From Swiss-Prot:
Undergoes proteolytic processing during the course of infection. May be cleaved into 46 kDa and 22 kDa products (Potential). Belongs to the peptidase M44 family. Binds 1 zinc ion. Its cofactor is Zn(2+). It comes from Variola virus. The lineage of its organism: Viruses, Varidnaviria, Bamfordvirae, Nucleocytoviricota, Pokkesviricetes. This is Metalloendopeptidase OPG085.
């Protein structure tokens, strides 16, 4: 670890795929409480800008921090990626503090599309922020556009809170002149912020939250000590369904169950977690997980690898102490209990977006203060990989699981999805068959539409056949290479339970790079949040799908795009009754 005079921390991580990865602690949307919810997320969207033909890049805003990364591709170099990321924050050697109203307006439209996307695919339920005075979704809404001047002032104010002590930088390599460049830019920031934000309200403990969830989850408040953090690292590397959450200076260990009986037994204090010592902790975490640790606990004074001896040599005492603290919090009701509930009729009037949630007090009724049984946990395997064809009945359940677990990766091709995970076959089956997970998987049907229309365009099956078997999506006919013929009509309107644009496009020069560039252009115009592409077996032919509330504008953009003169697009309007009648004509597509 390299520490600059103003306390910026720099780490060299040669295993990282990114060229540069930067995080800012105490800079997430928990700072929006008592201001305008969404300022942090809007700032993230305003800052990031790059040439998608020579860079891969992204940014994210969480409850307590913001992070940005950039990777060079094609003709760009690692140094180019570093300078590009730094340019998001500095202009002519000075920290950016000026944002045009037109740019703010476009990005607010983009935020509304992101809200729509996330609300269609996920359940946006940030329980901790909600209990602390925020909303269940805090990423910003379209009504921010009514206060553009106030929003701009808040953005400038937020930039002035950045300080050296909040900055963490990972670089793949520290090339010649890179350290000097960091000194001249991030090293020029004050060690402490120019504007000190007000303290974040303390979240309420002792609550039961009934809301959509794939698991029965308990958030247990523990002290944010070094030993407890090492204990969390130990548990995270060893077991599934264990993680942590922070808000302000508070730390919660999250434990999820698939069995309601074990969950209730844990809550009553009659059972403890069965934590066994493994052979050795290697700290082989992803760069995302490592960055999260440094940002959530900015007081850590050493490289995490400096603690590898301590976490292995003292694991027994660390885990005993953590287990005792967990049990004490259960008995004292220093917990937040998340109980899966999928009723569409319930909502909390404090949530301005009217998401389904009910909050109750966690009482001491039925507490047993002498545990007499232990609950086994799901152990992690080193690695596992499966391939699921689009016709497999478990496809949507696996997609749902990957969306609810960050350590599961999906890679999609024309025939199916490749899934990398670290579960055993028995544990995967137990999750897939659990009542709460099945209800959760079925509670957001919008994600299914992406695969319904992919099946329609990539196979010879009729829309009627596909809809009849939508729970399993249909097997794609991939034994022979499909020849796709485009008809005269480029637009087909349908009614579904969601609003989106999808279809197939073909062009002689069409490739993934040009489509990614197109996606970023649509994002800058505020018309979409993201777009998915699948390369079909027919030459220069892609299937694309995007959720959007601006369907006509997106269609007009795609219809006039010279990249793909051949196109067949489906525009879905959201309605209570599905109507696919426009797709029942043979002129749509022939395979």
């Amino acid at each position: 670890m390299i520490v600059l005079p103003n306390k910026v921390r720099i780490f060299i991580n040669d295993r990282m795929k990114k060229d540069i990865y930067l995080g800012i602690s105490n800079f997430g949307f928990e700072n929006d409480i008592d201001e305008i919810l969404g300022i942090a997320h809007l700032l993230e969207h305003l800052l990031i800008s790059f040439d998608s033909t020579i860079f891969l890049a992204n940014a994210s805003t969480s409850r307590s921090y913001m992070s940005f990364w950039c990777k060079s591709i094609n003709s760009a170099t690692e140094s180019d990626a570093i300078r590009t990321l730094v340019s998001w924050f500095f202009s002519n050697g000075k920290l950016k503090d000026n944002f045009s109203l037109s740019s703010i307006r476009f990005h607010i439209k983009e935020l509304e599309n992101e809200y729509y996307f996330r609300n269609e695919v996920f359940h946006c339920m940030d329980i901790l922020t909600f209990l602390s005075g925020g909303d269940l979704y805090n990423g910003g809404r379209i009504d921010m556009i009514d206060n553009l001047n106030i929003v701009r002032d808040m953005l400038v104010n937020r930039m002035q809170r950045i300080s050296g002590s909040n900055i963490v930088i990972f670089v793949k390599r520290l090339g010649p002149g890179t350290l000097d460049f960091f000194n001249q830019t991030f090293g020029s920031l004050p060690a402490c912020p120019e504007i000190i934000p007000s303290s974040i309200p303390v979240s309420t403990n002792g609550k039961i939250v009934m809301t959509p969830s794939p698991f029965y989850t308990v958030m247990v408040k523990i002290n944010p000590t070094l030993d407890n953090i090492l204990g969390i690292l130990y548990l995270y590397e060893t077991y599934h369904l264990i993680d942590y959450e922070t808000i302000g200076n508070q730390l919660y260990l999250t434990v999820s169950f698939i069995d309601e009986t074990e969950y209730e037994s844990f809550l009553r204090g009659e059972a403890i977690l069965q934590i066994s010592q493994c052979q050795r902790i290697n700290m082989n975490y992803s760069d995302d997980y490592m960055m999260n640790i440094y940002l959530n606990f900015p007081w850590l004074s050493h490289d995490l690898y400096d603690y590898i001896t301590r976490i292995n040599d003292d694991s027994k005492s660390i885990l005993i102490s953590l287990t005792n603290e967990i049990y004490t919090s259960i008995i004292n009701r220093d917990i937040i209990v998340i109980y899966p509930n999928f009723s569409k009729a319930m909502c909390n009037t404090r949530d301005t977006q009217q998401h389904p949630i009910v909050v109750l007090d966690a009482t001491n009724d039925g507490l047993i203060k002498k545990p007499y049984r232990s609950i086994p946990l799901m152990k992690r395997l080193t690695s596992n990989e499966i391939f699921i064809r689009y016709g497999d009945a478990s496809l949507m359940d696996m997609i749902t699981l990957s969306l609810s677990k960050q350590d599961i990766s999906l890679k999609r091709n024309a025939e199916g999805i490749r899934v990398k995970h670290s579960f055993s076959a028995d544990d995967i089956q137990a999750i897939m068959e659990s009542d709460s997970f099945l209800k959760y998987s079925r509670s957001k049907p919008a994600a299914m539409y992406q695969y319904i229309f992919l099946s329609f365009f990539a196979s010879g099956n009729s829309i009627d056949d596909i809809l009849t078997n939508r729970d399993s999506t249909l097997e794609f006919s991939k034994k022979t290479k499909s020849k796709i013929l485009f008809g005269r009509n480029a637009r087909y309107d349908v009614t579904t339970k969601s609003s989106f644009v999808c279809g197939i496009v073909r062009g002689k020069l069409l490739d993934k790079t040009s489509l990614v560039e197109m996606m970023w252009d649509l994002k800058k115009k505020g018309l979409i949040y993201s777009m998915e592409f699948t390369n079909l077996l027919s030459k220069n032919t892609f299937y694309l799908f995007t959720f959007t509330i601006y369907t006509d504008e997106v269609y007009d953009y795609l219809n006039t795009n010279k990249l793909f003169p051949a196109k067949c697009l489906v525009i879905s309007t959201k309605g209570d009754v599905e109507n696919f009648s426009s797709l029942k004509k043979d002129v749509v597509i022939r395979v």
